[in-house]
Amino acid sequence: MSGRRGDHPGRMAPTPGRRTRNGSVNGHPGMANYPPDDANYRRSRRPPPMPSANRYLPPLGEQPEPERSRVPPRTTRAGERITVTRAAAMRSREMGSRMYLLVHRAATADGADKSGLTALTWPVMANFAVDSAMAVALANTLFFAAASGESKSRVALYLLITIAPFAVIAPLIGPALDRLQHGRRVALALSFGLRTALAVVLIMNYDGATGSFPSWVLYPCALAMMVFSKSFSVLRSAVTPRVMPPTIDLVRVNSRLTVFGLLGGTIAGGAIAAGVEFVCTHLFQLPGALFVVVAITIAGASLSMRIPRWVEVTSGEVPATLSYHRDRGRLRRRWPEEVKNLGGTLRQPLGRNIITSLWGNCTIKVMVGFLFLYPAFVAKAHEANGWVQLGMLGLIGAAAAVGNFAGNFTSARLQLGRPAVLVVRCTVLVTVLAIAAAVAGSLAATAIATLITAGSSAIAKASLDASLQHDLPEESRASGFGRSESTLQLAWVLGGAVGVLVYTELWVGFTAVSALLILGLAQTIVSFRGDSLIPGLGGNRPVMAEQETTRRGAAVAPQ
């Protein structure tokens, strides 16, 4: 048994009887992609690779070609005159090549190209870029065309139509992927392909004279694209642990993916979409940003299929489960064959630290989803022209982007020794900010709340990832990560629904969401203290939960 010190809530306790990272059991076959640890290698300057906790990586069979460290200068023929235009073109080509090499070097750092993380980075960037381009495409219609009352009523109706199926399907995505041997890459590509079809439908129904879309087409397509974006996040979470390089942990992997998505997807993709939208709208009366969406989604579907095949391997995995029942016939991991012989199925309950971090992150996600939709309706209800409304929303969006980037930058450098404690503190901070914004009822208070909420959400998510990596055995880590992401997206949907349904007065909206945050904070604190307000879904479980069998009394420990 663990000592009392190890069972303290929020502390990462050592795992009794768990396979070590240095053991041969956990050594993944992908280590064949890294340099051999022989005598000549030890004498070299490069240190030997760290042992890996990722068992999904198979050998590629060949070493990648060494990348070019510099771009060779472009030479000119003798007697050729270099004009100002030609010099500018050469300089632009050289700068572009250097920028490409810089991005490629960052994307392949720490062995990411061998583990498959680089292949996953590009679809993640494409997903961020699609969201940013869609925001540009819909900005003109939402802020310069539709009436506020019409927007509010129709969005509430279509939100119910599109979000309700997602709320039912999202909890089933994780278990379905656990049972499928082949389907993760296809599911990722399908999330892009369906968005391509929706963008084409919007383009076909675009009215160039008014610069708008029919309401019955606009809102279902826009909300459905949001649902597919969230579905991509859930699907990606089940793939990420399988492409984790051996030299970095899950926290750094997710922070890297988010930073790449923000810089290469949200900022670069949004800027390109804005430029194309401006040119196409003024010259051709066409929705240029939607053409960018079509191009990015097609590229994203293709890039998703280039993710390594070993992400499909699920043999030997034990699915994770949110619930915990003490009276079930539990079975330690050294007796899996007895369970299979008797027809039972092993399940890995989440430990106390994980469930506490999950409740805290869900509470924060409610606030994030609320801030995603509610400020748009508040700005639309404001008695001002479209540019002022767009400026109000731009302030909130900038605060969210800065907070998200700062949170991911900070979380990658934090020592997450007690992640559950950090999650509780972030949840308290976000709840206090929501109450303060309800009292102030001003745009400045909303921007400050958005800034700190975005940063707190990134730090709390990194803490949840740290708990998942430490407190779950390797064979349940990918499943646990997918289950947690599904739950977080449902919490986001709940917050977005509150933002659509409540009245467009700042103090009213923040009062409504504060009531939900207080309930979530109470469950988080109670779970942290080892109890629960909801039976079976709280912290009344050990820090390191043993595996259970779904068949009550199906297996008995051998004598």
Swiss-Prot record:
Among SUPFAM superfamilies, the record links this protein to: MFS general substrate transporter
Q: What keywords were assigned to this record?
A: Cell membrane, Membrane, Transmembrane, Transmembrane helix
Q: Which InterPro entries match?
A: MFS, MFS_trans_sf
Query: Which locations, inside or outside the cell, does it occupy?
Result: Cell membrane
Query: Which Gene Ontology molecular function entries are recorded, alphabetically?
Result: efflux transmembrane transporter activity
Keyword RNA-binding applies = no
One cellular component term from this protein's GO annotations in UniProt: extracellular region
Classify the source by domain of life.
Bacteria
A single GO BP term for this record reads: response to antibiotic
Mind telling me which Pfam families this protein's record contains? MFS_1 (PF07690)
Q: How does it sit in the membrane?
A: Multi-pass membrane protein
Q: Which Gene3D superfamilies match?
A: MFS general substrate transporter like domains
Give the start-end ranges of region Disordered: 1-76
Q: Where is the composition biased (Basic and acidic residues)?
A: 1-10
Indicate the principal place this protein occupies in or around the cell: membrane
Q: Where are the transmembrane segments?
A: 128-148, 155-175, 186-206, 208-228, 259-279, 283-303, 358-378, 387-407, 428-448, 490-510, 515-535
Name the protein family: To M.leprae ML2143.
Q: Which PANTHER family match?
A: INTEGRAL MEMBRANE EFFLUX PROTEIN-RELATED, INTEGRAL MEMBRANE PROTEIN
What protein does this entry describe?
Uncharacterized protein Rv0876c
